[in-house]
Amino acid sequence: LVAQVEGGDVVEAVLDLGRAVLAEGGPVDAVGITNQRASAVVWDRATGEPVGPGIGWQDLRTVIDCLTLGAQGVRLAPNLTATKAAHLLDLADPDRTRDLCIGTVDSWLVWTLTGGARHVTDVTNVGLTGLRTADQLEWDQRVLDALRIPTAALPEVVDSSGVIGEATALPGAPPIAGILGDQQ
């Protein structure tokens, strides 16, 4: 099963909806983001453009990668973000020399809504990446090394509630005051 996410289309839909709601209802105190967890998007830090289509959580193209890693002692399921992000990096930057950002859909939306000011995700989204230690307190260097994922490409992990930035891409630049992955 192949399930791709066009990052630009997702952002345009969010911006169109946000602008329409704000035009109809007027200013808001804050906005929040909710999304399907475990989908992966990779974008260029300088241009803010996706380097290709993202991969949806249900995509199974990295099953063989998961089996290979499992034989090496790194156990990951194909519905996690980890191997999807590595696959996208392999396609866009096999030598890992570009300055790219990796994120789930919430990270991509926050990046775009804040004009590139914030590269973050929340604890509900990071929990389904496969890139954190079992206690979810830090990035799992063993997994990052196995997948050749640079730590600098990863988002900062923030609380699910609290102001994390201004949505300057929307009229009135409302604060983004919450991120929450689905099924919470």
Regions inferred by a protein language model and the residue ranges of each:
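Gly/Ser/Thr-rich active-site cleft segment
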Residues: 72-183
